């Protein structure tokens, strides 16, 4: 079965005090919606749309994103991404980002739902200049749990690399197989249908911020952890509530993003659920 071969190439530049997309090439099913500026001209919010409504076996999606110096870009998606399990061939998605000095990329897609039988492989590579930063998260639901579906076949692979000045800052490889062992093992899902990872990479995170990240997770019913990197921090979640996961990640994101002290967040991206 032939799937989509979609491409998206975005280039952002700093022009007269504003971050603007100066190149936006897209081929179906990927599309860039109109950019907007709820926080003012320096920070560009862009929404990447998948016009086919979900991924099916055989899809190959490639995205390349470049931020020129001083740009601030937040990229998200308009809704949950669905990976269907209808064909026994994998879906592959790759994302390669180049972030120049004094630029900040925020890669914050809404959650991904992996249907039973789906085979999904995502590769993410981010190259940072010495004074660049990136914030990113991934929220994944295994199976359509509202229908009682269990992720008992298929697989999910998530491979992330963040480099700065040619030095690896964070290499993260995760793999979940749709087997009983993976569903129940302590070092896998342990009966939880949700996993999430949030990272901020490219600068040192203070011990006070680390403690505040942990304090923000107080009262969470799922399991959480906060780990430091040489230049960054990683937060992880495993549990049953997407609302709980999203609430913690949004609070952590607001704490970590630069400029929050003097430039408080005006509003969430308009496509996010309230």
UniProtKB/Swiss-Prot annotation:
A single MF term (Gene Ontology): nickel cation binding
GO cellular component, one term: cytoplasm
Keyword Chaperone appears in the UniProt entry: yes
Keywords associated with the record: Chaperone, Cytoplasm, Nickel insertion
Pfam family, one: UreD
UniProt subcellular location: Cytoplasm
Disulphide bridges, residue numbers: none
Domain of life: Bacteria
Keyword presence, Translocase: no
Family the entry assigns: Belongs to the UreD family.
Purpose: Required for maturation of urease via the functional incorporation of the urease nickel metallocenter.
Subunit-structure text: UreD, UreF and UreG form a complex that acts as a GTP-hydrolysis-dependent molecular chaperone, activating the urease apoprotein by helping to assemble the nickel containing metallocenter of UreC. The UreE protein probably delivers the nickel.
Protein name, entry field: Urease accessory protein UreD
Lineage: Bacteria, Bacillati, Cyanobacteriota, Cyanophyceae, Acaryochloridales
Gene designation: ureD
